[in-house]
Amino acid sequence: MPEGHSVHRITRQFARNFVGRTVLLSSPQGRFAAGAEQLTGHVMTDARAVGKQMFLEFDNGLWLRVHLGMYGAWDFAGDIVMDATIAASNGRMGQTNQRGTDLAGTDLAGTDLSGDAVLDSAGENSLHSIGAPRRTRVRMAEQETLRQAQGPTEDTFPPEPVGQVRVRLLTETVSADLRGPTACEVLDPAQVDAVMHRLGPDPQLDDTPEAEQRFVDTVRKKPTRIGMLLMDQSVVSGIGNVYRAELLFRARINPHAPGKSLSDDTLRALWRDWAHLLAIGVNTGQMMTMDDLDETDYRLAMKNRADRHWVYKREGLPCRVCGTHITLEEMGARKLYYCPSCQA
């Protein structure tokens, strides 16, 4: 399931390519035909992410809410203008392990990025230039990959829909196809406010002391295990399985500890670390959770998922700190990774 950093990055692409433009909506699959009819032909005025959900506003006052869930993903095609943080980072755009095309070039400041490529061991390329728009196809979900369009799609725009496309958004130059979401619906402003009110704070949107205090107060009231609370989107927005495991290890917190047993200071530090890791994820496209790496180790970590986490998917392997074997168990029907010694 895409975690919060991915949804923020997708939203930035909508902000760069759709906001301020008239958008045509259709539902090639047919399931969203009525919703598409309500929005088509209107100007997109805002693109906003809250945790794992995205909200796109149109000039008729209606919003499109999308939650990708476990299997949802966006495919972009056309003359795409890459968001600067995506283009200049070691991020990837896509859900599959397709080999990308390295895009050598410059960033917005004119810096040559052609020598900075870091190839992922799964065959995914980094994205290295924003420059002039390129005719590309981009798939954005939990992991990110860029590939140049091949075959007829190089010369044909918009491309023919492929698979079960719930909704297509189309401008004169860019299209975005949504497949497999958990939620795709049209909301009015009151309904959007109601959904957002149910969501916990997201440090990418609100890093104020008030947001931090809201998180602390919510957790301190609950007897629920902290490993469950971090996955509860009404407590804090955007955290998924990877970030849960890594945040708890970095804080040396037992995932079974009741929320109300944790001190204010511990929870404040946890919130601030989440803000720190989320910012890294948004800016790089990677759930990089290891700090203070030298250049060699950093490049290895960007290439290989196994080298960028403390405990996630390291069950049975020795803890990087104490040597105890990492434990895997289920919590809330999701896999939980932790060190039984460091997090005792």
Region roles according to the model:
Residues 1-344:
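Structured catalytic/nucleic-acid-binding cores of DNA maintenance enzymes
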